A protein has these predicted regions:
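Conserved Switch II/interswitch segment of TRAFAC-class P-loop GTPases
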Residues: 40-45, 72-82, 93-155, 168-182, ...
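C-terminal-of-GTPase-core extension/linker across diverse P-loop GTPases
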Residues: 2-6, 11, 17, 146-260
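Conserved G1/Walker A P-loop phosphate-binding module
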Residues: 1-111, 139
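Helical mechanochemical/support elements of P-loop NTPase systems and associated helical scaffolds
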Residues: 31, 35, 48, 61-67, ...
Length: 260
């Protein structure tokens, strides 16, 4: 599985990536610190695999892996090429699911591209750029279908789906919330590889002080949770900076931070 870590500049994407992969990707207090996507592959521990290996005397044990892609910060106008946006959007299109990092902490030492902390505005900014990119994909598909359907009536169903999808996205809705009429439409929709159709989980990046109650006292986290619930997505609370510091410890030191 390949997961893409996305968000605005300076929200903690590369810091989270480093905590997950120990890759040491650059993270700094300025926009577009990441330009080319950083990629890290993390094995998924599974005790059952060890048991099976012993039972069958396996010479080699290959665990499942998750590939994380740290994608450079998106900005308003990314779908039109702002901030190297087209390149970044194409990187997102290659992943299976999206981890959307949203900043829910105050820190005057870390600049925010819009000047203040507002995670819902940040989410809307990213989602709009994904929507615009999807609409461009659908427009090109629609133009091709209009020409092809004249000689192949079997494409009528796909053309109808594309037109309904275009209207749905133009109204500001995400493709993942589109209701298909049958299994064939579901397969067609998946084949379009739309960004807003990909499963999304929101990573609410908080300060260390907010970890004790899992962000329950943080108003910004509450807003993200409410938004995600309406969208049908999940939220997890993390202090990416602390997680990165823990990831850099040796194995013995890490044990005191692990919850069983």
């Amino acid at each position: 599985m390949k997961l893409g870590i996305v968000g605005l500049p300076n929200v903690g994407k590369s810091t989270l990536f480093n905590s997950l992969t120990k890759a040491g990707a650059e993270s700094a207090n300025y926009p577009f610190c990441t330009i080319d996507p950083n990629v890290g592959v993390v094995p998924v521990p599974d005790e059952r695999l060890d048991v099976l290996a012993k039972m069958h005397n396996s010479a080699k044990v290959v665990p499942a892996v998750i590939e994380f892609v740290d994608i450079a910060g998106l900005v308003k106008g990314a779908s039109k090429g702002e901030g190297l946006g087209n390149q970044f959007l194409s990187n997102i299109r290659e992943v299976d699911a999206i981890v959307h990092v949203v900043r829910c902490f105050e820190d005057t030492n870390i600049v925010h591209v819009d000047g203040n902390i507002d995670p819902l505005r940040d989410i809307e900014t990213i989602n709009l750029e994904l929507l615009f990119s999807d609409l461009e994909i659908l427009e090109r598909r629609h133009a091709k279908l209009v020409k092809s359907v004249k000689g192949d009536k079997s494409l009528t169903k796909e053309l109808d789906l594309v037109e309904r999808l275009q209207k749905f996205l133009e109204d500001g809705s995400l493709a993942k919330n589109f209701e298909v009429v049958d299994e064939e439409e579901e397969k067609l929709l998946a084949s379009f590889n739309l960004l807003t159709y990909k499963p999304t989980i929101y990573a609410a990046n908080v300060s260390e002080d907010d970890l004790a109650d899992d962000g329950a006292s943080n108003e910004q986290v509450a807003k993200v949770r409410e938004y995600a619930k309406k969208e049908g997505s999940e939220v997890f609370v993390i202090c990416a900076q602390i997680e990165q510091e823990i990831a850099e410890l040796d194995d013995e030191e890490k044990k005191m931070f692990i919850l069983y």
